[in-house]
C-alpha cells in the first residue's frame, strides 16, 4: 500500500512554524504580515477559496485585506486598485484570485503587481528568478509539492520525473523546481503522443492535467511517487436526492494507482492544503524582508 503524503498534516505543522516566525518578529516589525486578496466577480468557487485563505491568515496572525470588485469592473479600475496595494505599507503580499471573469486578461494584471509583493509567485520577474535559481516568491502549488516530498525524505537526485501539464501556474514552475533538485524532467501536455510510454518511465509523476481521473494504472511505473495536483467536483447522484454530498476527485484514479505507487497524495487533503500554506510562506517571507527581520523560511522557498 502506498504511503499517503498528507498535505493537511504538514500544512498544520508549517502554520505553527509561521506563527512562531511572526511572534519572533512582531515587536521589531511593529505590525503583523499583511496579505491583500483581490477578488473580481462572484464565482462561487473563488468565494470558497478566498474564504479559506482568509481563515488561514487568521489562524497564524496574518492581517487579511480583501478587495471585492464587480465582474463589470474596468481594467483601469483594477490596475488602480493594484497600484494602491503596491504602495500600501500594511501589505506584504498581493494575491489576484484566479480565474478572472471573461474579458479580463490576467497577464497585464499580474504584471502590475509589485514583484516584491507577489504572494502567488506568478510575476514574470519571479518566474525568471526561479529559472535562474535566485531567491524570491515561489509558485505556491509547486512549492507545496516540493515541501511535501522533502517532508517525507523523497530524494529527487538522479530520478526521472514526468510532469503532466505545462501551465505557468503549476506545470512549468514544477518542472523547474524538480530540475533544480537534480531530477531529469520531461513535461507532457495535450499534444504528447503515447502518454503511457512516457509516464511509465517516471520515478516521480506529477499530474496537473486538469482532467478528472485521467491517469490510471497503465500510466504508472511500479514504485513510483505519484503527486495528484487536480481537484474536481463530481456530479451528484440524483438517486440520493437531498442526502447527496459533493464528491471530490483528482486527475488520478487513486484506487487503481495506489497498489502500484510507493507514495501518493490524496485528494482532498494532499496538495490543496499545501498551496494555501505556501501562499502564507511567501507572505511572511516578504514581511521579514520588508521589515529587516531574519529570514527563517529559506528552506521552503527553494
From Swiss-Prot:
Record keywords, A-Z: Amino-acid biosynthesis, Histidine biosynthesis, Hydrolase, Methionine biosynthesis, Multifunctional enzyme, NADP, One-carbon metabolism, Oxidoreductase, Purine biosynthesis
Binding residue positions for NADP(+): 165-167, 190, 231
Entry superkingdom: Bacteria
EC number, UniProt record: 1.5.1.5, 3.5.4.9
Gene Ontology MF terms: methenyltetrahydrofolate cyclohydrolase activity; methylenetetrahydrofolate dehydrogenase (NADP+) activity
Signal sequence region: none
Keyword match Amino-acid biosynthesis: yes
Catalysis: reaction(s): (6R)-5,10-methylene-5,6,7,8-tetrahydrofolate + NADP(+) = (6R)-5,10-methenyltetrahydrofolate + NADPH; (6R)-5,10-methenyltetrahydrofolate + H2O = (6R)-10-formyltetrahydrofolate + H(+)
A Gene Ontology term for the protein's cellular component: cytosol
InterPro entries noted in UniProt: Aminoacid_DH-like_N_sf, NAD(P)-bd_dom_sf, THF_DH/CycHdrlase, THF_DH/CycHdrlase_cat_dom, THF_DH/CycHdrlase_CS, THF_DH/CycHdrlase_NAD-bd_dom
Record function comment: Catalyzes the oxidation of 5,10-methylenetetrahydrofolate to 5,10-methenyltetrahydrofolate and then the hydrolysis of 5,10-methenyltetrahydrofolate to 10-formyltetrahydrofolate.
Pathway membership: One-carbon metabolism; tetrahydrofolate interconversion
Classification via PANTHER family: C-1-TETRAHYDROFOLATE SYNTHASE, CYTOPLASMIC, C-1-TETRAHYDROFOLATE SYNTHASE, CYTOPLASMIC-RELATED
Family membership noted in the UniProt record: Belongs to the tetrahydrofolate dehydrogenase/cyclohydrolase family.
Entries under Gene3D superfamilies matching the protein: Leucine Dehydrogenase, chain A, domain 1 (3.40.50.10860), NAD(P)-binding Rossmann-like Domain (3.40.50.720)
UniProt name for this protein: Bifunctional protein FolD
GO biological process, one term: methionine biosynthetic process
The protein's assembly and partners: Homodimer.
Amino acid at each position: 500500500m502506498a504511503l499517503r503524503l498528507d498535505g493537511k498534516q504538514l500544512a498544520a505543522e508549517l502554520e505553527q512554524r509561521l506563527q512562531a516566525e511572526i511572534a519572533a518578529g512582531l515587536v521589531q516589525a511593529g505590525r503583523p504580515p499583511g496579505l491583500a486578496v483581490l477578488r473580481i466577480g462572484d464565482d462561487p468557487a473563488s468565494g470558497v477559496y478566498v474564504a479559506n485563505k482568509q481563515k488561514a491568515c487568521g489562524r497564524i496572525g496574518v492581517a487579511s485585506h480583501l478587495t471585492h470588485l464587480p465582474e463589470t469592473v474596468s481594467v483601469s479600475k483594477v490596475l488602480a486598485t493594484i497600484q494602491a496595494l503596491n504602495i500600501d505599507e500594511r501589505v506584504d503580499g498581493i494575491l489576484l484570485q484566479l480565474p478572472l471573469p471573461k474579458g479580463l486578461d490576467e497577464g497585464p494584471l499580474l504584471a502590475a503587481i509589485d514583484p516584491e509583493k507577489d504572494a502567488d509567485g506568478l510575476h514574470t520577474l519571479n518566474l525568471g528568478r526561479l529559472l535562474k535559481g535566485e531567491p524570491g516568491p515561489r509558485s505556491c502549488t509547486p512549492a507545496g509539492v516540493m515541501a511535501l516530498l522533502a517532508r517525507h525524505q523523497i530524494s529527487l537526485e538522479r530520478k526521472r520525473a514526468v510532469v503532466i501539464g505545462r501551465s505557468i501556474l503549476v506545470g512549468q514552475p514544477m518542472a523547474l523546481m524538480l530540475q533544480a533538485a537534480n531530477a531529469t524532467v520531461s513535461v507532457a501536455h495535450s499534444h504528447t503522443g503515447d502518454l503511457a510510454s512516457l509516464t511509465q518511465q517516471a520515478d516521480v509523476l506529477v499530474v496537473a492535467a486538469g482532467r478528472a481521473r485521467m491517469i490510471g494504472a497503465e500510466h504508472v511505473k511500479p514504485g513510483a511517487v505519484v503527486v495528484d495536483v487536480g481537484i474536481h467536483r463530481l456530479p451528484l447522484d440524483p438517486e440520493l436526492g437531498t442526502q447527496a454530498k459533493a464528491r471530490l476527485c483528482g486527475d488520478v484514479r487513486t484506487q487503481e494507482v495506489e497498489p502500484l505507487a510507493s507514495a501518493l497524495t490524496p485528494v482532498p487533503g494532499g496538495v490543496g492544503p499545501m498551496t494555501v500554506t505556501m501562499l502564507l510562506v511567501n507572505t511572511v517571507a516578504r514581511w521579514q524582508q520588508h521589515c529587516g527581520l531574519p529570514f527563517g523560511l529559506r528552506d521552503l522557498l527553494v
